[in-house]
UniProtKB/Swiss-Prot annotation:
Coiled coil: none annotated. The keyword Lyase does not apply. Catalyzes the rearrangement of hydroxylaminobenzene to 2-aminophenol. This is Hydroxylaminobenzene mutase HabB. It catalyses: N-phenylhydroxylamine = 2-aminophenol. One of its GO terms (molecular function) is (hydroxyamino)benzene mutase activity. Keywords: Cell membrane, Isomerase, Membrane, Transmembrane, Transmembrane helix. The chain crosses the membrane at residues 16-36, 50-70, 78-98, 121-141. Addition of ZnSO(4) decreases the activity to 70%. It comes from the Bacteria. Its EC number is 5.4.4.1. It is found in: Cell membrane.
């Protein structure tokens, strides 16, 4: 497992914060589009998904330096988090504009169904993002199992020092 330092964690943590606030903003803006949608009920879901998933990315960005994960697990968590959160917003946004989503979101869609291609795309997005978010949450929980591994060459070694 590669050790991570604050300087190596900072770019990904900052990127998660940027992507989180951007998705939060997209979620807010989606609320203004509801009257233009074929199914505003699913559009409301998109509005909420953007806002809530934006907050999830913000929370993940803030806790990022606390995660004890190797390089590969960190890259996977980052990629799955970004994909899962943005796909959730986009899939419900498209379903709202298309008047689709009845196959995967029967309650939210309120009986609206789209073409086979639209329903297939929405189904793929919702299933894949759900699996992605499960992986992200499992990795984050695993990463919080212990104190993060840090290498700090500026601080004195912990514990008793041998006599000189």
């Amino acid at each position: 497992m590669t050790l991570h330092t604050p300087s190596t964690d900072a770019p990904l943590a900052r990127r998660l914060l940027q992507l989180g606030i951007a998705l939060f903003l997209l979620g807010l803006l989606t609320g203004f589009l509801l009257p233009m949608m074929a199914n505003p009920r699913v559009g409301l879901s998109s509005h909420l998904e953007g806002v809530l998933n934006g907050m999830f990315l913000l929370a993940l960005g803030l806790m990022w330096p606390q995660l004890s994960l190797g390089t590969g697990a960190r890259k996977a968590a980052f990629g799955f988090a970004v994909y899962g959160t943005y796909a959730n917003w986009l899939a419900t946004l498209l379903a709202g504009f298309w008047g689709a989503g009845g196959r995967m979101m029967p309650i939210a869609a309120g009986g609206h169904t789209g073409t086979a291609a639209q329903e297939g795309l929405i189904a793929f997005a919702l299933i894949s993002l759900s699996l992605s978010m499960l992986v992200v949450c499992a990795l984050a929980l695993w990463g919080l199992r212990s104190a993060p591994a840090r290498r700090n060459t500026d601080a004195p070694a912990a514990g008793p020092q041998p006599a000189a």
